């Protein structure tokens, strides 16, 4: 099976190299960027969630913390992907070949790549330091020094995570269209990444329970569902806050971004799919689930979590593609391949970190 997936990855790499040097280079690099920001965000946010649980000292979270840490296994791959992105800068970012004088202090290649790679190195290093600290033996109740040390690392991790992921939103995504800007976009990107991470955590937790690798009572799974519900609302709140301010401001350089995506096909259809699959369906189901006793069956929660993951992945497509290749059709084949290949690499069963 490993040989098979190795061959699949090899074929995918060859196809990517051919496509990156063809007339469809803009689509190929757009697909690459979508997968990069989606999966790298998930990989870094798992340890961040564990950091939140460490700082708050949630009593139900020790097993969940170890499961959340498994996403860190993808971080080395993510860093390599960040390095490869440099090769596509002239295709993705117009300001590389046509500098914008008013934004040149921030949007210039040396500074752009320095902060992108430096932030990634710092974030990934802190993630691994936190993973290493948490995977040690359990802290004795009287060992306040070790608990304080872990809390300090967790606070540093959360700070670095918020700054870095917000910068990914501003730099890697928003600068694809350097004339458009939104002060909320970095926060929106961080919140949507956090939403996907809670969706993934729900799936991993239920799967670990089913395989006997963790023992989580229904009430603990219900707590995860509450967090997933809260993040879905916060995600939509950030989107609506951003949308309504730009729409009522009616400044062409700002409204153009939404007009191209919400009122032009095929992006208009995709926008409705993201709204319904990523928010309306999860909101309706989770609202019903959270108003009663914790159910014993968790399959519907897994389905809703998958909906959330797929919706945010499509939202990344919705944001990236019109900026790079607005006339392109949706390349579902390559997108599906990239999604499945990265999902396989991010599978906790393939990571070194054990959840048992």
Identify the role of each PLM range.
Residues 5-16, 20-22, 27-47:
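N-terminal ordered "arm"
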Residues 53-55, 204, 319-328:
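A cytosolic-side transmembrane-helix exit/cap motif
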Residues 185-189, 253-276, 297, 328-356:
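Membrane-interface transmembrane-helix boundary segments in multi-pass integral membrane proteins
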Residues 263-323:
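Extended, compositionally biased non-globular segments
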Residues 72-87, 230-239, 303-315:
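Hydrophobic alpha-helical membrane-insertion segments
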Residues 29, 36-139, 157:
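Transmembrane-helix bundle segments that line or gate the permeation/cavity pathway
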Residues 1-22, 106-274, 285-291:
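Long, contiguous internal "core" modules enriched in hydrophobic/ aromatic residues
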């Amino acid at each position: 099976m490993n040989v098979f997936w190795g061959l699949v990855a090899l074929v995918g790499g060859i196809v990517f190299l051919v496509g990156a040097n063809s007339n469809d280079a803009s689509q190929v690099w757009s697909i690459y960027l979508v997968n990069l920001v989606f999966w790298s965000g998930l990989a870094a946010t798992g340890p961040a969630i564990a950091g939140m649980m460490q700082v708050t000292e949630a009593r139900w979270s020790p097993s969940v913390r170890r499961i959340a840490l498994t996403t860190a296994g993808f971080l080395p791959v993510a860093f390599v992907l960040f390095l490869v992105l440099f090769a596509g800068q002239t295709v993705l970012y117009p300001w590389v070949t046509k500098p914008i004088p008013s934004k040149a202090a921030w949007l210039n290649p040396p500074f752009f790549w320095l902060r992108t790679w430096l932030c990634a190195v710092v974030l990934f290093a802190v993630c691994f330091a936190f993973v290493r600290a948490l995977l040690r033996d359990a802290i004795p109740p009287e060992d306040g020094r070790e608990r304080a040390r872990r809390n300090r690392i967790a606070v540093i991790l959360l700070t670095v995570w918020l700054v870095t992921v917000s910068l990914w939103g501003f730099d890697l995504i928003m600068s694809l269209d350097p004339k458009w800007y939104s002060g909320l976009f970095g926060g929106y990107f961080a919140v949507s990444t956090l939403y996907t991470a809670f969706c993934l955590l729900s799936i991993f937790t239920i799967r670990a329970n089913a395989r006997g690798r963790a023992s989580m009572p229904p009430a603990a799974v219900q707590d995860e569902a509450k967090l997933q519900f809260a993040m879905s609302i916060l995600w939509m709140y950030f989107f609506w806050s951003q949308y309504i301010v730009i729409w009522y401001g009616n400044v062409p350089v700002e409204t153009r971004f939404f007009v191209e995506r919400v009122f032009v096909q095929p992006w208009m259809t995709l926008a409705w799919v993201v709204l319904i699959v990523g928010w309306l369906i999860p909101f309706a189901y989770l609202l019903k689930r959270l108003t009663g006793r914790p159910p014993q069956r968790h399959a519907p929660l897994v389905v809703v979590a998958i909906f959330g993951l797929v919706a945010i992945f499509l939202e990344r497509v919705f944001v990236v593609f019109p900026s790079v290749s607005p006339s392109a059709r949706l390349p579902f084949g390559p997108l599906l391949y990239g999604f499945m290949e990265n999902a396989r690499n991010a599978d906790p069963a393939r990571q070194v970190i054990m959840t048992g």
